[in-house]
Amino acid sequence: VSDSQNSQDGLDPE
């Protein structure tokens, strides 16, 4: 998963 918003948390990237 390449999320830049929720990269700190383990949440799904929006």
Swiss-Prot record:
GO CC field: amyloplast; chloroplast
Pathway given in the UniProt record: Glycan biosynthesis; starch biosynthesis
Alphabetical keyword list: Allosteric enzyme, Amyloplast, ATP-binding, Chloroplast, Nucleotide-binding, Nucleotidyltransferase, Plastid, Starch biosynthesis, Transferase
Listed EC numbers: 2.7.7.27
Catalytic activity: alpha-D-glucose 1-phosphate + ATP + H(+) = ADP-alpha-D-glucose + diphosphate
Domain of life, per lineage: Eukaryota
Biological process annotations from GO: starch biosynthetic process
GO molecular function: ATP binding; glucose-1-phosphate adenylyltransferase activity
UniProt subunit comment: Heterotetramer.
Family assignment from sequence similarity: Belongs to the bacterial/plant glucose-1-phosphate adenylyltransferase family.
Function comment: This protein plays a role in synthesis of starch. It catalyzes the synthesis of the activated glycosyl donor, ADP-glucose from Glc-1-P and ATP.
Name of this protein: Glucose-1-phosphate adenylyltransferase small subunit
Natural source organism: Spinacia oleracea
